[in-house]
Amino acid sequence: MLRIRTTLLVLVLIHAPLGGCSDADVRPRSAPGEDPSAPELAVEVTDSAGIVHRRSPAAALRRTAYEVAPEAHVVIDGTEGGGQPLHAVGAVAFGPEGTLAIAERGEMGVRRHDMTGARLSVVGRDGQGPGEFGALNGLGFRADSMFVFDSRWSRISVFGPAGEYVRQVVPESAAGDRPRWFAFDPEVGILTTSRGAEGDLGWGLHGFDGESIASFPDAPSPANPKMGLVGASGETPPVRLFQAQPVAGLWNGGLVATSADRYRLELHDRSGVLREIWSVADTLPRRVTDDDVDAARRRAIAATDPDARPAVERRWSDVETPGRFPAFGASSGIIFIDPPQIVAASHGDDHELWIRAYPADPGVGPRWWVFRADGTVLGSVEFPARFELHAVSEAGAVGVLEDEFEVQRVVVYALDPAGVESRARASAGG
């Protein structure tokens, strides 16, 4: 039986070494003159001094960790109980006692449903007052209290178990601006971004009353030059193709964030000190081809109003592309979308981390890599196309499924962990 306790983190990676076989069986990609049959290197884990502690092969990432049921066993379209259809879902989370919470910007409230899909209640409405929202972008639960992030008013509203408004939390900002982004861990705290006086964007960790716990000035952040996300100067900056979004999250009591090339992740403790680095071999993600660029150009022009297409075509005269696709994260190809998610879960006594692989091939369903806390690579999970994962629990995987007409539904897919359990027994000698 699958038993997973989950925490939704908005954005990125693990704290432990990755492994699918022993160190003796794994070598870096072969150099000239070496055995070409040596396993292809996937991940190399080092400490802050650069000392390698574990290497993992690519094959471990290619096996299936969980089978996803062909049909969702919970489907919510928003019309249950006389409600309006779902529109612009900002966040979905599993709540206590077998419930689901859906932060939805169309109705500007948080809907609560049971696992049959029946609508139980709605909290909040459009406005600026207590318990009202301007833009819903994040959800989190701590015991039976619900934390809801409003990016427009840069605040967090806390609701009790009966849906009653309790209080407002405004995270303190050492960077000189109010928070703009939200990640929640019921055991660690609240992670936000805020923009400083010079325009730099940094990460801040806060307690559940908004008090500042730590800042991470040396961690990669969206406006940090290490990220390479700032366009060239001039009226028409180059089109930045296939760039992964800034990725960071709370896990194992600290912050994990990416560096510039998207093949490297840094783990910082609660005090901001860099403890470990994961380097993903740049031999793994496939190269960007001329066909990839041409296809992205065609999609951009087709999605543009005919009157505006000449301007789009002029902008596409200057295109910047990386040599290879990023290893993980998400991107719309041209326009940055909401940050990709990181899902942390527990399976029995093991903690897992799910990381989204970069969607290099259009039309292929989103793929997630799954790791145990000790770094063992369970494998990957592939979901249907147009499905965005938000959380994992014993009930399955919940997220937003959008059809070709952009109609949204919140769905839950069952997960079959039989392969994971059999591998665990085999590794234990059972």
List where the protein language model places each region.
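Bacterial N-terminal signal peptides
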Residues: 7-19
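Eukaryotic scaffold repeat domains enriched in small/polar residues
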Residues: 21-430
